[in-house]
């Protein structure tokens, strides 16, 4: 990683901040290939195998540019990889290398700005800020004091050129943008990667990181309006309203185009000190302590703002206004709600005693069992009714590998849903996976489940499925309560950066 930074700084100093020449640097593809294998940005070693050849990548880019001028384009086909070869090499494989390298190159300006910003502000970089669970403690602290919430399904761009135009404000290198346009326009398979679905968008596994970067950057651009309104409508500049990446050009664009004559009126309408915004993937939540009239103003303002200035078509029905007191939020695989908790207090004055009823709001999070059963059913661990079935595709593995896979899946689910107030749903998931594991082992040994468990003992499976529960004792070593009371606690882990996909175990 340090060698990568040194080479990057040297190349940037020689090229005067032009990122296009970085595409032809060998260490970029070595870093991209190794990061793709380990799925981590912070690497110690940037090794790569002999399949990634810088010479072939350079030849492929040269051939692509030649095709642009000759207007004799060819296609990268996933299903017909044998026919699409240049210089005897598979073009689809090296197009993947180019996209991975290009994704790193376009991330460089933002990474350097982030590093410089953190150094100027003297802020401590913490991996906990990237945890998915870090959102829920924030919701617990803030949402219990709010009244209304907007459930927002973020619209998708109607054309990939919009993503390039948004990126143009940050990347001043015209050559890189032209190459990006060529990738997006010349290959129909890439133009169909972003497909609108029921709730948000779907991106193919091909070049997923590259297109997620473009989409997230596009969403981050219009999210800057919340920071802008918050800063302009506050008398005191709060630290919490500062952005990690300052965007001078975006602020100028807002001042000149969006808020020309009606800026003061908009600030008057949206001046709300208790506005909170949370987003994950294609869904966002905007909560406020204001009235329903204020939330309606926000709703139609967002729709018009997306359509007029970011060319994203959004319908008002994709934004729902709900009252937190009688609505459950379906967000990040949790059902969250704010319920009224009554507390009876007995007070005694001299000879008279009376009861005082205190009401307080509490933020609850529950694990929805129905979507999880559907997820397990799709992964062939049970049927649609939740009855466990065997996993035939794993029958060829060793017994230890089968048990380890089932145990790892349960520990991942239990680890992520440890913040659920009630653990009944986790008990059912544990039952499904344990019985599915037993049936898979019995199928392998051509025996019944009862005979197999009688021969090896139930403790063999229990050892793998109870490892996660020991974490609770390590988290609260001084608590002297029973295991049942301890297991009902809500625990948020700050080391979860993604939701594990059960399909990855196929």
Swiss-Prot record:
InterPro entries xref list: Domain_X, Maturase_MatK, Maturase_MatK_N
Q: Which UniProt keywords apply?
A: Chloroplast, mRNA processing, Plastid, RNA-binding, tRNA processing
Show which residues constitute the signal peptide.
Answer: none
User: What Pfam families is this protein classified in?
Assistant: Intron_maturas2, MatK_N
GO biological process annotations for this chain's record? mRNA processing; RNA splicing; tRNA processing
What family does the database annotate? Belongs to the intron maturase 2 family. MatK subfamily.
Q: What is this protein called?
A: Maturase K
Query: Lineage of the native species?
Result: Eukaryota, Viridiplantae, Streptophyta, Embryophyta, Tracheophyta
């Amino acid at each position: 990683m340090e060698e990568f930074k040194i080479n990057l700084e040297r190349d940037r100093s020689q090229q005067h901040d032009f990122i296009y020449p970085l595409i032809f640097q060998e260490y970029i593809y070595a870093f991209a290939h190794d990061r793709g294998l380990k799925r981590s940005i912070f690497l110690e070693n940037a090794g790569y195998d002999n399949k990634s050849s810088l010479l072939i990548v350079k030849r492929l880019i040269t051939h692509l540019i030649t095709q642009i001028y000759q207007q004799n384009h060819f296609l990268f086909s996933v299903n017909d990889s044998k026919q699409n070869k240049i210089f005897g090499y598979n073009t689809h494989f090296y197009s993947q290398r180019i996209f991975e390298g290009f994704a790193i190159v376009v991330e460089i300006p933002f990474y350097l700005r982030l590093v410089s910003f953190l150094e100027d502000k003297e802020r401590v970089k913490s991996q906990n800020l990237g945890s998915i669970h870090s959102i829920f403690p924030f919701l617990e602290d803030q949402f219990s004091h709010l009244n209304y919430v907007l459930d927002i399904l973020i619209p998708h761009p109607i054309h990939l050129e919009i993503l390039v135009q948004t990126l143009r404000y940050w990347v001043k290198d015209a050559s890189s943008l032209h190459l990006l346009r060529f990738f997006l326009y010349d290959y129909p398979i890439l133009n169909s990667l972003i497909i609108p679905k029921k709730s948000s968008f779907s991106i193919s596994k091909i070049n997923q990181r590259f297109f997620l970067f473009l989409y997230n950057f596009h969403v981050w651009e219009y999210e800057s309006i919340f920071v802008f309104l918050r800063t302009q409508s506050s008398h005191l500049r709060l630290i919490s309203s500062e952005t990690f990446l300052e965007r001078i050009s975006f602020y100028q664009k807002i001042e000149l185009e969006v808020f020309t004559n009606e800026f003061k009126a908009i600030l008057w309408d949206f001046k709300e000190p208790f506005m909170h915004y949370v987003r994950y993937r294609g869904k966002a939540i905007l909560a406020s302590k204001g009235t329903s009239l204020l939330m309606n103003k926000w709703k139609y303002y967002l729709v018009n703002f997306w359509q007029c200035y970011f060319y994203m078509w959004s319908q008002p029905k994709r934004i729902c206004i709900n009252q937190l007191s009688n609505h459950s939020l379906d967000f990040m695989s949790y059902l969250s709600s704010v319920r009224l908790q009554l507390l009876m207090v007995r007070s005694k004055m001299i000879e008279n005693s009376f009861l005082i009823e205190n009401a307080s709001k509490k933020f609850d999070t529950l694990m929805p069992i129905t979507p999880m059963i559907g997820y397990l059913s799709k992964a062939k661990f049970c049927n649609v009714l939740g009855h466990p079935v065997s996993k035939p595709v794993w029958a060829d593995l060793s017994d230890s590998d089968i048990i380890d896979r089932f145990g790892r899946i349960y520990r991942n689910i239990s680890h992520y849903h440890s913040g659920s107030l009630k653990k009944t749903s986790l008990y059912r998931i544990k039952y499904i996976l344990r019985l599915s594991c037993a049936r898979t082992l019995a199928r392998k040994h051509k025996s019944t489940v009862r005979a197999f468990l009688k021969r090896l003992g139930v403790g063999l499976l229990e050892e793998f499925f109870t490892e996660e529960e020991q974490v609770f004792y390590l988290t609260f070593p001084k608590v002297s309560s029973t295991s049942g009371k301890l297991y009902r606690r809500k625990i948020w882990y700050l080391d979860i950066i993604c939701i594990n996909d059960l399909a990855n175990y196929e």
